[in-house]
Every structure is written in C-alpha cells, then in structure tokens.
From Swiss-Prot:
Listed InterPro entries: Ribosomal_bS6 (IPR000529), Ribosomal_bS6_sf (IPR035980), Ribosomal_S6_plastid/chlpt (IPR020814), Transl_elong_EF1B/ribsomal_bS6 (IPR014717)
Name of the protein in its database record: Small ribosomal subunit protein bS6
Entry keyword set: Ribonucleoprotein, Ribosomal protein, RNA-binding, rRNA-binding
A molecular function GO annotation: small ribosomal subunit rRNA binding
Domain of life (superkingdom): Bacteria
Amino acid sequence: MAASELLKSRVENLRDYELVVILTTDTPKEKVEAILEGISKTIAEKEGSFTEVNHWGKRKLAYLIGRYVEGYYVFIKMKAKPSSIRKISTDLRISEQVIRHMAINMDEE
C-alpha cells in the first residue's frame, strides 16, 4: 500500500447519521437540553453539525425496558465523523437519564 493510500484511509469524512435518544420521562427539560448540547459540542469539535432536531415527546415504549414503560424521544439528523459517533454513544451509555439510543449511518445503503 502506497503512503498516499494509507493517508486517505485514515482521513475521516463527514457522514450523514440519524440518532434517536430515548430519555426517562422524568428528565427535566434543562437536562434534555444539556444532553443535546453535549452531543452538539462533541460533533462540532470534529467539524460536524446538527441538520435537524425533533422532540417527539413522551411515547409508550414497544416493550418494557428496565422498569420503564414510557420514554421521551428525541430524533436528530446530523453530519458527523465516525469517531464522534463512538464518543457520543459512550457518553449516552453512561448517562442515567438515557434509556436507549441508536445511531444509524445513512450513507450506507
């Protein structure tokens, strides 16, 4: 492998992602905004950005997750680098307010 090919394989490009975050229904609005701000800051550090944020609100879960039957849903479309998504996923996994989350790469079809 040539040196230029090796460099190209290490360069991360921005990709389109959709992220759904399900929070506990008792999460204060300020905490919801703080979580979204943290996600935005993480992707902005690597030149990414939100393209759309929709608060779907409180909805019944399809099945019981832990002790929760309802969750507060937030849907986010964004441009981000894969390393940003890994960091966001780690941060959301350790947050006590987050019941579940899923990031989908929309560039892969």
